[in-house]
């Protein structure tokens, strides 16, 4: 399944942050002059020229515009230091829809968030809407070139590596089920890198409000992968209706 990115620059490069040189490459891939690109980006040609030469930094606002104008992947959106925050179900649904998740396609809008930041926000949530939880494994499948170093580091800082490991394992199983062997191998390698930091402490997959009775039931009825990652969840790859690519 396509990620919904048709521009030829998408076939040339997947970038995790926007630099002046990458803006220049994107502009040339679009066969645009500096003047044409500047007009579309809402800046002066002189300013764009300085950015492309590295004399001015790419601001977050310009990076966001570039993602829309050049149609580069959302993984190009700038990342900052992670801060825990409370997001409601509507936020996650809208952002997933904007990133192309089929289950929330009807919410597709123009505002996007870097998928790695969205995934971290979700993994750090105490409670998520079940439909959002089911969508998490889609993010590593649709955006395999996300910034794994940033994600892993922040997951460990927040003690969320078990949640991350389980979600990536679900994505790996989905890739295997879909016959995408190369992606399956890449995701398996990501899971393996998380193994040494696996926590013994029991956790939920973003369902902290579940009752003690539910917790007791899940200890006996969870998939092996959930047990391995010490998570109380019955989510399995068979339940993921919209993750196949």
Indicate where each model-derived feature is located:
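Short, charged recognition helix plus adjacent turn
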Residues: 78-106, 236
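N-terminal flexible/basic segments that precede or flank functional cores
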Residues: 1-18, 25, 214-228, 234-235
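Recognition helix of helix-turn-helix/homeodomain-like DNA-binding domains
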Residues: 41-57, 77-81
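Short basic helix-loop element that most often maps to the first helix and adjoining turn
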Residues: 21-40
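Charge-dense, extended regions
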Residues: 183-245
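Mid-protein regulatory/catalytic core that forms ligand/cofactor-binding pockets
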Residues: 2-10, 105-197
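Helix-turn-helix DNA-binding elements, focusing on the entry/boundary residues of the two helices
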Residues: 23, 34, 45, 60-63
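DNA major-groove recognition helix of helix-turn-helix/homeodomain DNA-binding modules
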Residues: 42, 61-76
